[in-house]
Amino acid sequence: MQMVGTEILENIIMNNPKQLTFPWSKPNRSELNDFFFDEKNLKLKDVLLSDEDFFLYGRNKVGKTYLMQSLCNLYAKKDKTSLYIPLKDILNLGPSLLESLDSLDLICVDDINLINGKDNWELAFFNLINNCLTSKCRLIFCASINPSQLLFELKDLESRIKKLDSFEILPV
């Protein structure tokens, strides 16, 4: 039986309360110490290790996904809850997946630009951001484009994301 919406997340939470991943993802052993931070990217390491929300961007294959998964693994080692959300893999499941996630310690969202023009997804992320602001859940968004290039239909969502500090991962 295929589960949809919050049923997937409920099942995941029950199976592993520390690090949450979607059931089709392979085991991930990414670690920040294995990522090469050169002089151009040293500030990024400090931001990753902070408690701040931020927006991460850069060309394809520079390590955005790796860094977010590494951060989720770090949170798991500290007995904190985290969730990596690969939007390209879950858009067809619907935005109800985002309900009640603000109780987590960290949410990393990959390819946030993919929700552009998808009204239900935009509203769900707007609500998630607002809920995380009050619950202290840390949010990290990533895309291959600079956040200044995001053009969401829901302008309140656009302004919330554009207010975040942004960091570009520069190729080595």
Language model features with spans:
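A short, basic N-terminal segment
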Residues: 2-47
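Walker A/P-loop nucleotide-binding motif
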Residues: 52-68
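P-loop NTPase Walker A phosphate-binding motif
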Residues: 66-79
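Short glycine-rich substrate-engagement loop in P-loop NTPases that contacts/grips substrate
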Residues: 76-106, 119
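Conserved nucleotide-binding/hydrolysis micro-motifs of P-loop NTPases
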Residues: 88-91, 113-114, 139, 145-150, ...
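Conserved P-loop NTPase "ATPase switch" module shared by AAA+ and STAND
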Residues: 100-121, 128, 135-144
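Short regulatory helix/loop adjacent to the ATP-binding pocket of P-loop NTPases
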Residues: 147-162
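Conserved AAA+ ATPase "SRH/arginine-finger" region at the nucleotide-binding site
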Residues: 164-172
